[in-house]
Regions:
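Signature for the C-terminal beta-barrel architecture of outer-membrane proteins
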Residues: 2-161
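Flexible glycine-rich, low-complexity coil/linker segments exposed to the extracellular/periplasmic environment
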Residues: 157-186
Protein backbone atom coordinates (compact mmCIF):
# COMPACT_ATOMS: atom_id res chain seq x y z
CA UNK A 1 0.00 0.00 0.00
CA UNK A 2 1.13 3.51 -0.64
CA UNK A 3 1.06 5.94 2.24
CA UNK A 4 -2.22 7.80 2.66
CA UNK A 5 -2.71 11.49 3.56
CA UNK A 6 -2.55 12.42 7.24
CA UNK A 7 -1.13 9.03 8.16
CA UNK A 8 1.97 9.86 10.17
CA UNK A 9 1.66 10.66 13.84
CA UNK A 10 4.87 11.08 15.79
CA UNK A 11 5.06 10.15 19.46
CA UNK A 12 7.42 10.80 22.34
CA UNK A 13 7.74 7.39 23.94
CA UNK A 14 9.65 5.13 26.26
CA UNK A 15 9.73 1.35 25.75
CA UNK A 16 11.12 -1.58 27.67
CA UNK A 17 11.85 -4.86 25.84
CA UNK A 18 12.48 -8.30 27.31
CA UNK A 19 13.33 -11.20 25.01
CA UNK A 20 14.17 -14.72 26.12
CA UNK A 21 13.77 -17.88 24.10
CA UNK A 22 10.35 -17.89 22.46
CA UNK A 23 9.07 -14.99 24.58
CA UNK A 24 9.02 -11.32 23.62
CA UNK A 25 7.55 -8.80 26.08
CA UNK A 26 7.28 -5.07 25.48
CA UNK A 27 5.92 -2.33 27.70
CA UNK A 28 5.56 1.28 26.56
CA UNK A 29 4.21 4.73 27.36
CA UNK A 30 3.72 7.32 24.62
CA UNK A 31 2.24 10.73 23.93
CA UNK A 32 1.55 12.21 20.49
CA UNK A 33 3.80 15.09 19.48
CA UNK A 34 2.35 18.54 18.78
CA UNK A 35 4.15 19.83 15.68
CA UNK A 36 5.20 23.47 15.74
CA UNK A 37 6.66 25.52 12.87
CA UNK A 38 10.09 26.34 14.31
CA UNK A 39 13.10 24.05 14.73
CA UNK A 40 13.28 21.82 17.85
CA UNK A 41 10.08 23.28 19.36
CA UNK A 42 7.77 20.24 19.24
CA UNK A 43 6.27 19.06 22.53
CA UNK A 44 4.32 16.09 23.81
CA UNK A 45 0.55 16.54 23.83
CA UNK A 46 -0.49 16.59 27.48
CA UNK A 47 -4.10 15.83 26.52
CA UNK A 48 -3.42 12.33 25.10
CA UNK A 49 -1.57 9.28 26.44
CA UNK A 50 -1.12 5.79 25.02
CA UNK A 51 0.39 2.89 26.98
CA UNK A 52 0.51 -0.86 26.86
CA UNK A 53 1.98 -4.29 27.43
CA UNK A 54 2.45 -6.62 24.45
CA UNK A 55 3.55 -10.25 24.82
CA UNK A 56 4.37 -12.72 22.04
CA UNK A 57 4.96 -16.45 22.56
CA UNK A 58 6.13 -18.29 19.45
CA UNK A 59 6.43 -21.98 18.61
CA UNK A 60 3.67 -23.40 20.78
CA UNK A 61 2.38 -26.92 20.01
CA UNK A 62 0.47 -27.41 16.72
CA UNK A 63 2.56 -24.62 15.09
CA UNK A 64 0.69 -21.97 17.07
CA UNK A 65 1.98 -18.53 17.96
CA UNK A 66 0.19 -16.38 20.53
CA UNK A 67 0.03 -12.64 21.20
CA UNK A 68 -1.57 -11.31 24.39
CA UNK A 69 -1.79 -7.59 24.98
CA UNK A 70 -3.23 -4.68 26.91
CA UNK A 71 -3.45 -1.17 25.45
CA UNK A 72 -4.58 1.96 27.29
CA UNK A 73 -5.71 5.28 25.81
CA UNK A 74 -6.56 8.58 27.47
CA UNK A 75 -7.91 11.56 25.56
CA UNK A 76 -8.96 14.58 27.60
CA UNK A 77 -10.89 16.10 24.67
CA UNK A 78 -12.47 13.17 22.82
CA UNK A 79 -15.26 14.07 20.40
CA UNK A 80 -17.93 11.58 19.32
CA UNK A 81 -21.57 11.87 18.23
CA UNK A 82 -22.43 11.81 21.94
CA UNK A 83 -20.44 14.99 22.55
CA UNK A 84 -17.07 15.97 23.95
CA UNK A 85 -15.61 14.51 27.15
CA UNK A 86 -12.62 12.72 28.64
CA UNK A 87 -12.15 9.21 27.24
CA UNK A 88 -10.24 6.48 29.07
CA UNK A 89 -10.28 3.29 27.03
CA UNK A 90 -8.65 -0.06 27.81
CA UNK A 91 -8.14 -2.80 25.21
CA UNK A 92 -7.50 -6.48 25.95
CA UNK A 93 -6.51 -8.50 22.92
CA UNK A 94 -5.28 -11.86 21.77
CA UNK A 95 -3.98 -13.05 18.43
CA UNK A 96 -3.37 -16.63 17.32
CA UNK A 97 -1.31 -16.98 14.16
CA UNK A 98 0.89 -19.40 12.32
CA UNK A 99 1.43 -21.63 9.35
CA UNK A 100 0.95 -25.36 8.96
CA UNK A 101 2.23 -26.70 5.65
CA UNK A 102 0.32 -24.71 3.00
CA UNK A 103 -2.30 -23.30 5.39
CA UNK A 104 -1.70 -19.97 7.15
CA UNK A 105 -3.97 -18.36 9.71
CA UNK A 106 -4.29 -15.17 11.70
CA UNK A 107 -7.16 -14.78 14.22
CA UNK A 108 -7.49 -11.77 16.50
CA UNK A 109 -10.04 -10.72 19.14
CA UNK A 110 -10.08 -7.39 21.00
CA UNK A 111 -12.36 -6.13 23.76
CA UNK A 112 -12.50 -2.49 24.84
CA UNK A 113 -13.91 -1.05 28.04
CA UNK A 114 -13.66 2.25 29.89
CA UNK A 115 -15.38 5.59 30.41
CA UNK A 116 -16.41 8.45 28.16
CA UNK A 117 -17.52 11.31 30.39
CA UNK A 118 -20.37 9.80 32.45
CA UNK A 119 -20.94 6.96 29.96
CA UNK A 120 -19.43 3.49 29.71
CA UNK A 121 -17.39 2.06 26.86
CA UNK A 122 -17.95 -1.53 25.73
CA UNK A 123 -16.69 -2.45 22.25
CA UNK A 124 -15.10 -5.35 20.41
CA UNK A 125 -13.42 -6.40 17.19
CA UNK A 126 -12.82 -9.78 15.60
CA UNK A 127 -10.51 -10.23 12.62
CA UNK A 128 -9.40 -13.29 10.67
CA UNK A 129 -7.25 -13.88 7.64
CA UNK A 130 -6.86 -17.53 6.66
CA UNK A 131 -5.22 -18.67 3.47
CA UNK A 132 -3.93 -21.61 1.47
CA UNK A 133 -0.91 -21.31 -0.84
CA UNK A 134 -0.23 -23.42 -3.93
CA UNK A 135 3.21 -23.63 -5.52
CA UNK A 136 3.00 -23.11 -9.27
CA UNK A 137 6.57 -24.09 -9.99
CA UNK A 138 9.73 -22.08 -9.40
CA UNK A 139 9.15 -18.97 -7.33
CA UNK A 140 5.53 -18.58 -8.43
CA UNK A 141 2.85 -19.09 -5.81
CA UNK A 142 -0.90 -18.61 -5.66
CA UNK A 143 -2.63 -17.82 -2.36
CA UNK A 144 -6.38 -17.98 -1.82
CA UNK A 145 -7.59 -16.43 1.41
CA UNK A 146 -10.66 -15.43 3.34
CA UNK A 147 -10.53 -12.27 5.39
CA UNK A 148 -13.37 -11.27 7.67
CA UNK A 149 -13.47 -8.37 10.12
CA UNK A 150 -16.26 -7.56 12.57
CA UNK A 151 -16.30 -4.33 14.58
CA UNK A 152 -18.90 -3.25 17.11
CA UNK A 153 -20.74 0.01 16.52
CA UNK A 154 -22.86 2.35 18.57
CA UNK A 155 -26.61 2.12 18.07
CA UNK A 156 -27.75 5.15 20.07
CA UNK A 157 -26.01 8.52 19.65
CA UNK A 158 -28.39 10.00 22.24
CA UNK A 159 -27.12 7.99 25.21
CA UNK A 160 -23.78 8.61 26.89
CA UNK A 161 -22.40 5.09 26.30
CA UNK A 162 -19.96 4.26 23.50
CA UNK A 163 -20.08 0.87 21.80
CA UNK A 164 -17.97 1.70 18.74
CA UNK A 165 -14.60 0.01 18.49
CA UNK A 166 -11.74 2.54 18.42
CA UNK A 167 -8.74 1.38 16.33
CA UNK A 168 -6.65 4.23 17.87
CA UNK A 169 -4.30 4.93 14.93
CA UNK A 170 -5.67 3.27 11.78
CA UNK A 171 -4.24 3.74 8.33
CA UNK A 172 -6.37 5.94 6.05
CA UNK A 173 -8.16 3.11 4.25
CA UNK A 174 -8.38 0.56 7.07
CA UNK A 175 -11.23 -1.58 5.77
CA UNK A 176 -10.64 -1.44 2.00
CA UNK A 177 -9.52 0.85 -0.80
CA UNK A 178 -13.20 1.71 -1.42
CA UNK A 179 -14.26 2.45 2.16
CA UNK A 180 -16.19 5.71 2.33
CA UNK A 181 -16.05 6.00 6.11
CA UNK A 182 -14.00 5.00 9.12
CA UNK A 183 -14.65 2.72 12.05
CA UNK A 184 -15.84 5.16 14.71
CA UNK A 185 -18.50 7.86 15.04
CA UNK A 186 -16.36 10.97 15.26
Amino acid sequence: YRERPNMRLSHDAVMGIYHRGNWDVRVFLARPVVLNLEVFDNKSAASNSFWGLYTVRENLPFTLNLDLYYLGWRNLNAIYDQGQAEEIRHTLGTRIWGKRKKLDYNLEFLYQFGKFGQGDIHAYALATDTGYTWSLGGLKKLRFSLRADVYSGDDDPNDSDLNSFNPFFPKGKHISQLAASGLINQ
